[in-house]
Every structure is written in C-alpha cells, then in structure tokens.
Curated annotation (Swiss-Prot):
Enzyme class: transferase
Enzyme active site: C116, H255, N285
Functional note: Catalyzes the condensation reaction of fatty acid synthesis by the addition to an acyl acceptor of two carbons from malonyl-ACP. Catalyzes the first condensation reaction which initiates fatty acid synthesis and may therefore play a role in governing the total rate of fatty acid production. Possesses both acetoacetyl-ACP synthase and acetyl transacylase activities. Its substrate specificity determines the biosynthesis of branched-chain and/or straight-chain of fatty acids.
Family to which this protein belongs: Belongs to the thiolase-like superfamily. FabH family.
Entry note about domains: The last Arg residue of the ACP-binding site is essential for the weak association between ACP/AcpP and FabH.
Protein's name according to its UniProt entry: Beta-ketoacyl-[acyl-carrier-protein] synthase III
Amino acid sequence: MGKIYASLKSIASYIPPTCISNVDFEKTLDTNDEWITKRTGIKTRYFALPSQQTSDLAYEAGKKAIERAGIEPKDIDAVIVATLSPDYLTMPSTACITSFKLGIENKAAFDISAACSGFVYLLSLAKSFIESGTYKQILIIGAEKTSSVLDFSDRSTCVLFGDGAGACVIGSTNDEKAAILGVNVSANGRYQDFLCTPRVHATFGATQAQEKQSFIQMKGNETFKVAVKTLVSEVKEILNTHHINPQDVSFFIPHQANLRIINAVGENLNFTPEQIVVSIQKYGNTSAASIPMAMNDLYEEKKLKYGDLMLLDALGGGLTWGSALVHFGGTN
C-alpha cells in the first residue's frame, strides 16, 4: 500500500441573501463608493439575515460540500469550524450546532479561533488527522457572521467585512498530485492589538462605550505593513520547502482582506494576474470564509480541475498567519 496523503475532495460555499453596496453606506456614514473602492477594492458585500446564525451559514456550505464529495453526512468523522463570530460566546461550539443540523451525531466537533487565518489552520489540523489515520473524512468550514461584531458607525471597519461560509471535505488519496502537499501556520501575540475585539462580551447593563468594545477594532496601517512582509516571507518559505516555482502554481488564492495587500504580495512573488484569484470586490473580507469562498468561485466557474495546484495564504488577528500548497483532489 502506498503512502496516504490528505486530499481536498470537495469545495462549496454559501453567500447570504442581503447584498450591501458601497453606495448603501453613503446613507449612514461619511464615506463614498470611490473612497472605499480605492482603499480596499471592495464594491459589495453580503450580510446574513437577523434570524441567521453562523451555524446556519456553515450548515448550507457544509451540506453542499458533502454532496459534492459524493458521500453522506454519516461518513463524516469530524466537523471543525473556524470562526470569530460563533453562535454562542463560549459554548457550545458552532461546530457542534452545525454538525447536529447536518445530521452528524456522536462524532468529533469543535471550533478553532485563528481569525482570518482560520481556514489555513483548519487545513493543517485536517491534514494531520487524516495522515495519522485518526479520521477518514473531515468536514472543515470557515464561517462568519461578521455583521454581528461590527460597529456600523465606524467607517474604518464596517465597510470592510462581509458574511459567508466556505466548506471542504478532506479525505485521503495515494496520488501525490491530488494531495495537500504542505501547510505552515504561525502566530505572534506581540501584535495582538492590531486586530481585536478589546472586550470579549458586554455584560448586561453595559454602557454604550462598553458595548463598542465588543466590536472589531483594527490598526489598519500597522496591519498592512506587517501583512505584506510576513505573507511574502511565508509564501517564499513554503515554495522553497517543496521546491516549487511560482510559475508551477495553478492558482494563488490569498485571504481576501484588502486588494492592495493582495496585489503587493502577488507582485513581489511574480505571480501573473491570471494566477491570482480575487473575490474581495464581491464579498469583502469574510475572515475565515474568504479563501474557501474564492476557491468555490473557481470551482463553479469550471476553472478548477483535478490536480490543479493552489497556493493559499492568510494573515489575521492574533496575529496569526499561514500558507498551504493544495492540489485539488475532487472532480468538476
């Protein structure tokens, strides 16, 4: 029997129903479409309904990913969700709720907290679980209802984010050309205040000022500088480790945080425009969901084929960051 590799078998996403354009923000904020587009590359984003929770978004993406993998919910051994906007503050995990909604019971389910790097962290965990023989089929989901943690009076943050979910089934293969080749993850708490919610949760009777501490806060300029330098270094490292040249990568799929960061990293690494996948103009920054949502766009546009090599990278609150080299092991 040959070596067992972890393999990305399917990809799916869920986009919430409410589309919010930059023009919509002009009605309530001192901002405009030109200002937002120039600084971020974002034109629209989608927000969940008030009645929808993060687990609802995760469920929709997860259900489709399972179907596309050609398996049943009962075949899933573990459900892992990455999110910064869970259904409950501390417990139960969004993964537990999502797995129940999917009809997956008496299997492992837990959340991870790595902010915008969450999906890369999910891949690292899933790869280890599969290749160690611990599990055979894992459902990983990046899901966010960032609209629940945004201060809609703060134009520096609320225009940046969107809601959504992306899911993958990770299984096994003997074919290295369908394998998750490698995943690197790292973090440095030195930068913890660059992206944060200073107060985890406002207690009952909290003042308005205390409530605002429950929303996302960001030091944009500082984050930009660290992001470009860190991501370029991270991508170079994983390419060198696996002896892969940039031109051998089918698609470079970065976390969709800011178009200026995406372009700066892509240009520094000499990727062509055809290699770089950009979806931020449609969805905004969907945190842990952004990479699988961008990947799903490729899939649904029939551009993603068996064996295609994807290079992923992300940086998020923590600060956390990571990169991955992933062959697509599914069918399209």
